[in-house]
From Swiss-Prot:
Residues 55-201 form the Cupin type-1 domain. It comes from Sinapis alba (White mustard). The keyword Manganese applies. Residues 1-20 form the signal peptide. GO terms for molecular function: manganese ion binding. This is Germin-like protein 1. It is found in: Secreted, Extracellular space, Apoplast; Secreted, Cell wall. PROSITE patterns: GERMIN. One of its GO terms (cellular component) is apoplast.
Amino acid sequence: MKMRIQIFFILSLFSSISFASVQDFCVADPKGPQNPSGYSCKNPDQVTENDFAFSGLGKAGNTSNVIKAAVTPAFAPAFAGLNGLDVSLARLDLAGGGVIPLHTHPGASEVLVVIQGTICAGFISSANKVYLKTLSRGDSMVFPQGLLHFQLNSGKGPALAFVAFGSSSPGLQILPFALFANDLPSELVEATTFLSDEEVKKLKGVLGGTN
């Protein structure tokens, strides 16, 4: 019986290892099927050095929008070589007063490093405890997987930061957009958020929601 348990444990351990760790890499094939562990692998004969490089983070994003912020992601499959390696990154540009609203990454934890400006960042634990920190150039902060967190430009000029994730596809859900940028009926939003009808319709108008 003890031997069976040991064998089961070993098999479970090996089954949890990503496909990319069995081979050298698993470059994403965007034309193939996607599963919870990532994209299917590109034919190794078709893989080139370009699959392992990404040049999209050197240019500032467009912050002319309602949140005065831009996120430039380097995720799979756009950065195909990341597939299966449990790592990715993104660039954050925040104009004056810009904010990345409360959001979560269901698939990964996040580490942020400030390159320029001052950013007020924080997250809320599952016990509803708030962890808040004002970050300056060179400062870093970690945001645990799945917890609500935000970044706000609290300085006088623009702010720039880079973030890294523990997944090639960390996922993203922005709370205000999830509530007010879709067709969820206003009466349900009001009932579940304790906001008035006027407040809900105002936010839906700003973020493009209906009903």
